[in-house]
């Protein structure tokens, strides 16, 4: 009768317990881990049969059915069923042969049965043994092939033969699981050192399935024979009975190297899992020898010999922090990148291609190529024109053709970020150690293997010693017989039987029974003198062998030396160069800046604090005196405040009217179309209520010799080192202390050799040297820059580079210079849309706190809006290559060439630059250099071929 789970009458649970029975069956992985070490394999809880007899009781929450509950028929008729009273909730008691009834509470049985199942999965299926690095199925496959004589020197045999042998003798599970395990041990892209040589289709890195087992053939790899299966017949490991007790199989293979680290392992058990990366054989031997020589070696010392895993598919391991964690604690994250190189496809068009030659471990190449194609299709990856897989038997080659002008580094970074070309290997180094699953670091794994290998070498030495001693004992008896051959022959011929001859030899020469038997088995041809010499030589050889074995077994040091020697021999025979390269740069995590092109862009800020970022080709080049193109719709009573040119990777410094500076990357500002209103700055910066941004400075590098020159509306100037602004916190920092009623308006980058040009709203211009402005700290006030009259205010400021100072100093203010055709010039822009160029040599340098020279003759309702130094670079005809962007209060933008603006004297009124009509006044102006124009010529749209980006 099958045992039935039951409760005894005295232990009937209450209804609440019955209702919560299902929750009792929910076992967590934490319960398994807590319980595992509490119950060894020999614990009674792991037994399937219970011996305590009692009555079997069935419980039901429903009313019992009428009649008798028949438990069985035929021979079970002696069992009787009787009804219980309602007090027992309608239970039925089965009485009969109580020795065949097993009472047990259901929730306990469920817990313990699940625990037994979990232990079975842990120890017998999912986790590898730290000694030979194999799971039971892999061990049984290799042992079955060894028993079938499928060595590397013999012909291949069908895989179906191996699978059948494994299933029939050692592994009574599905043939698919066995064949899949066999196939994986033959794949060079799955194991760093394959253990089986395959003949036929064994799958591919594209996840193509292998051919059926009836078609493929296999045999053992020489490395498997040398590392795992040698000395198997010398009592080096224990053998256990197979599933039906018909024969024996090894409990572990006598590995000569830590195969768990050599090929790694992965598996999912109940409540725990393992994922161990593969390593290089040569480095593994080196670190093993280092630990043998110095058992107290630190992890850093071991890393000098084996710095990181070595994956069979190669790749680049990024950083060593994850490797250190994995080797120290057993858990870590190793970031692996595929290996790619840039190849020039067409020298004429300068089109490039990214060639992928290696991919991360356990990455499906076909899936990777398909994923890249999908990302190109949905515009996630840009700059790619074609992708194809040219891989063959000679190696991997995935070609990704780039569009003309595409940045290979940017495309690669996007591939790393959006595809499996960069992936992480999560190490979880769990293995079976001393019959229990254990999380171990590198040193602990190596030490566990060394202890096991010492045991194997000791058992092998004792086995050889025993055989040598037995053989020497026999040889000594044979030599005695040969020394007395005539007497021995006479004694044997006189003996009446075999047993009497044996007894006579023992008594006559003091031989043992085995020695006497050996003498009787000698043939006549071995009685020659030559044969006698062979026996004596063998005796001497055995004596020497016994001495060496006894010396080996005398100390652990000798055993460790032999382990090291055998490991070095394997290294000399099987080692190969490292495939996975190490890059000691970072963890491989890509920031936004790594995947965003450093393109030039336009940034517009309104008076009410709205900002937007636009593409460089948004505004085309126009002629002087035209209306221009709108920069977008503005809110009611809003006007354009600033309009500048920057690059996506620049740090953009936002200076407020209160002297506070904020910072963000340019690409973090949302990109908008020309007609969009923009994003409020308060959503990007932590600005105070009522605070306005008055100046924006893009910075690509915080150089030591660069400064920020700040100028307030009331003419207060200050110079601060640019490096002090490299670490601006999110809430901003103080840039300048302001006097009451003053506000910060202009901030420019400069060097000590530059000049600064300042202009007031009434047209007064002053030139001063930047080195004449003392460098101050951030949290200080400035000094007076320009003496202002009649409630005049500062209108603009610009920097004159040091390269232009020499030209300016060589020229004097002369009438012949009024129409000077070579720069540099000061470009004046008025609020009413007028402007002109005045030679820079028309203005003399002065110290700070001076009135300056008049530079413009205004109409009654006009004032100066901006001043720029132009003429940094000239065309072949000596004219300026720069352009100026004008923005009106209504948001209309016009971009014109500087060369189209007339060169006039200081007292002239200028020419019309932009017809304002209903657009209000000029709100801001920005200058575009010729270098900026050249950088972005290839990025303009077809509709703006003649345009240059801002």
UniProtKB/Swiss-Prot annotation:
Keyword Protein biosynthesis on entry: no
Catalysed conversion reaction: ATP-dependent breakage, passage and rejoining of double-stranded DNA
Spans through the membrane: none
Keywords carried by this UniProt record: ATP-binding, Chloroplast, DNA-binding, Isomerase, Mitochondrion, Nucleotide-binding, Nucleus, Plastid, Topoisomerase, Transcription, Transcription regulation, Transit peptide
EC number: 5.6.2.2
One GO CC annotation: chloroplast
Domain (Topo IIA-type catalytic): residue spans on this chain: 127-595
GO-annotated molecular function: ATP binding; DNA binding; DNA topoisomerase type II (double strand cut, ATP-hydrolyzing) activity
EC class name: isomerase
InterPro entries, sorted: GyrA, GyrA/parC_rep, Gyrase/topoIV_suA_C, Topo_IIA-like_dom_sf, Topo_IIA_A/C_ab, Topo_IIA_A_a_sf, Topo_IIA_dom_A, Type_II_DNA_Topoisomerases
UniProt record, GO biological process: DNA topological change
SUPFAM superfamilies: GyrA/ParC C-terminal domain-like, Type II DNA topoisomerase
UniProt motif GyrA-box: location: 622-628
Assembly: Made up of two chains. The A chain is responsible for DNA breakage and rejoining; the B chain catalyzes ATP hydrolysis. Associated with the mediator complex.
Function: A type II topoisomerase that negatively supercoils closed circular double-stranded DNA in an ATP-dependent manner.
Name assigned to this protein: DNA gyrase subunit A, chloroplastic/mitochondrial
Organism: Arabidopsis thaliana
Encoding gene per record: GYRA
